């Protein structure tokens, strides 16, 4: 009422009702403005998602068009070998768009083959390429055997974690897996805050990103779609999350680090140690449609070690202690992860959730 001119207050017979009506209209106008802004942002994010999905479909079409086709000679050798074991089977041998060999054997009598000692080595000799079981097909029915060309590189992974003091659960979540393309994917997410809500946010982030990556979506595109999903759902119960994604091609050693708001990562190759920083904000913070994550590419050679950690472990730019740990030349990645976590705890306490993931690349034995 005091904001109104005196002459108006003196002449208005229903001043309280007038003030209430004006305030209600101002609130409604503010809500409408907020809604318009939200709709505009959502349209922008949705448009970015459509562009990303178009990119996904385009890549799928390119992959289908670049299939190298079946290998009939290898198929005939494989069928002859199976018949020599009295196994009547359907077999297919082909190379995908990336040149990786795929072998599928279907039969109701695979048990004699699987009971053979070193059956993978024998099948590898038949088709002329070293084979391994498909992780995606593990646990399938015993009437179907899916094999893939084995990668020349192998990895060992170590994980150590500690929840914030006084909390029942950690808000950090992570996972690692190998795709059928022979790419190791390591995901680490840190939900904002601590406790159950942060744990739920980070778990959802990891689950969504894993589904995209296992489906063959390009990692950079998968990260952008994840960011869009969090932007669209930030008005519900979801918060924000920092995201680390490391992808290692186990055929070539080509490695990409993708980051949204994440703490620095470290890579030791030979005698050099590289610090990989992040400039972007956490996933789910509105910063424009289609904003890509920070991306760093490099090649990891056998003997290289990477350390990925949440911000409870790496505080500010104080990292000389971590570099000293890396220079000690740990061969056991679990021991390196535990040592890193222990040193961080002694320096900074447990004022935040703390998670360390260590990765070492080696030649396959």
Regions found by a protein language model. Give the residues of each.
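Short hydrophobic/glycine-rich mini-motifs in sensory/regulatory modules
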Residues: 24-28, 98-101, 152-155, 180-185, ...
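Catalytic core of PPM/PP2C metal-dependent serine/threonine phosphatase domains
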Residues: 69-99, 118-141, 150, 199-270, ...
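Soluble C-terminal extramembrane regulatory/interaction domains of multi-pass membrane proteins
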Residues: 1-126, 130
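PP2C/PPM family metal-dependent serine/threonine protein phosphatase catalytic domain
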Residues: 149-173, 227-233, 263-297, 341-347
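N-terminal entry segment of metal-dependent catalytic domains or homologous docking segments
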Residues: 126, 139-192, 197, 203-207, ...
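Conserved beta-strand-loop-short alpha-helix elements that form
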Residues: 182-194, 257-261, 296-319
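Active-site-proximal, acidic helix/loop segment immediately C-terminal to a metal-coordinating Asp/Glu
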Residues: 193-215, 281, 287, 304-351, ...
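Short strand-connecting beta-turns/loops that link adjacent beta-strands
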Residues: 180-182, 250-252, 364
């Amino acid at each position: 009422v005091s904001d109104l001119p005196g002459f108006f207050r003196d002449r208005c017979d229903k001043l309280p009702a007038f003030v209430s009506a004006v305030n209600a209209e101002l609130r409604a106008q503010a809500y409408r403005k907020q809604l318009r802004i939200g709709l505009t942002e959502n349209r922008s994010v949705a448009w970015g998602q459509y562009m990303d999905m178009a990119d996904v479909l385009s890549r799928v079409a390119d992959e289908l068009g670049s299939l190298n086709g079946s290998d009939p000679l290898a198929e005939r050798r494989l069928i002859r070998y199976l018949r020599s074991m009295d196994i009547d089977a359907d077999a297919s041998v082909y190379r995908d768009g990336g040149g990786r060999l795929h072998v599928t054997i279907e039969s109701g009598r695979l048990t004699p083959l699987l009971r053979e000692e070193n059956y993978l080595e024998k099948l590898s000799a038949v088709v002329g390429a070293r084979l391994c079981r498909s992780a995606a097909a593990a646990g399938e029915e015993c009437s179907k055997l899916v094999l893939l060309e084995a990668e020349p590189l192998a990895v060992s992974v170590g994980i150590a974690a500690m929840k914030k003091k006084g909390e029942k659960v950690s808000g950090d979540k992570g996972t690692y897996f190998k795709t059928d393309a022979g790419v190791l994917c390591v995901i680490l997410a840190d939900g904002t805050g601590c406790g159950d809500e942060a744990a739920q946010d980070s778990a959802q982030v990891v689950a969504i990103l894993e589904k995209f990556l296992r489906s063959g979506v390009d990692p950079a595109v998968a990260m952008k779609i994840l960011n869009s999903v969090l932007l669209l759902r930030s008005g519900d119960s979801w918060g924000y999350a920092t995201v680390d994604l490391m992808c290692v091609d186990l055929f070539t050693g080509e490695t990409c680090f993708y980051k949204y708001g994440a703490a620095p990562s470290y890579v030791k190759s030979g005698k050099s140690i590289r610090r990989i920083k992040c400039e972007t904000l956490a996933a789910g913070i509105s910063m424009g449609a289609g904003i890509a994550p920070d991306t760093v590419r490099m090649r990891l050679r056998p003997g290289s070690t990477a350390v990925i950690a949440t911000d409870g472990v790496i505080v500010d730019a104080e990292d000389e202690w971590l570099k000293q740990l890396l220079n000690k030349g740990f061969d056991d990645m679990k021991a390196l992860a535990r040592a890193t976590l222990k040193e961080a705890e002694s320096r900074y306490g447990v004022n935040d959730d703390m998670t360390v993931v260590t990765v070492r690349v080696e030649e396959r034995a």
